[in-house]
Amino acid sequence: MTVNLEEYFRTTFEDKLLVKMPEREDDHLTPATRLLEKRREMSEVEQALGAQKEEFQMKMESLQQRREELERKEYQLRESLLKFDKFLKENDSKRARALKKAQEERDMRRAKDCEIARLKEDTSGLMKGRDKVQHRLEKYIIYQQYLEKVLENAEEFQEIREIIARYDTLTATHQDLLERELKNQEKYEKEKARLIKFTEEKNNEILNYNNQLANLQTKLEKTQSVAVKWESQWTHIKNTAAKKTLLLGRIKMATHNLFMLVNRHLGQTGMVDMTDKQLDKIQVFIQDLTQITLDIKRAENAITASGANTAG
């Protein structure tokens, strides 16, 4: 336990540490007397403080002893609680085992009761079965008598069980023949259904092919009509192209002739194979010739006007 001594003295022994000072009657005392008085007061304060410290230390030791005693009692109490808890757990375990054993005995007794009831039901069922078998035996005794008479009159059988075995064989053969007939009938019905389905599918396919053939025939006729139309247009295009080709050849020939005339007029011998370049040169020549002609006409007009003015 941590103790703040300063806080303890301040809160607990504040009143005790206050020393009542005498009223101010020392105005007539000398400084030496006052110093002695102050030392005496300090000594009294230190004695009081020492006494308080001893008292505090004694209380702290008492508190420490009390705390140790409380811890010891707490440990003893905790040990007692652990022992008591262990005792309760052991009692609970014994009680649980006893309850479990009692429950197991009740379950076992209940199972035995159920088994007894089931055995009683089985016994009752067996008794009923025995009575039923006895009744059937009494009912079928006439068949045994009949088989005995058959055995007396039939030379091929020596015992009744031979007759029964022959009957079982004939019955099994008859049942086998019935099953074969049923399987054959089912197979026949399946094959018949498959044939009908196959015939319907083929008829549908033929009908579908006929429809497709009709559509293809219609498309063929349309295609042939379009082909005739396009063939006519192609012939027209070829004829038009031939005419335009002829015209283009004539234009190129005329352009070449004009180009040659321009070259001779200009005194040039250079050759140009491209028609568009030939046309460009011809255009420039015509523009120059036109400009020269205009200049000559303007000069003639000027001369005529000057002569008229002179005559006047």
UniProtKB/Swiss-Prot annotation:
Coiled-coil intervals: 34-121, 172-233
Keyword match Coiled coil: yes
Gene Ontology cellular-component annotations: cytoskeleton
Alphabetical list of InterPro entries matching this protein: CFAP_domain-containing, DUF4200
Domain of life: Eukaryota
Alphabetically ordered keywords of this record: Coiled coil
Pfam families for the chain: DUF4200
Stated family: Belongs to the CFAP73 family.
Protein name, entry field: Coiled-coil domain-containing protein 42 homolog
Organism: Nematostella vectensis
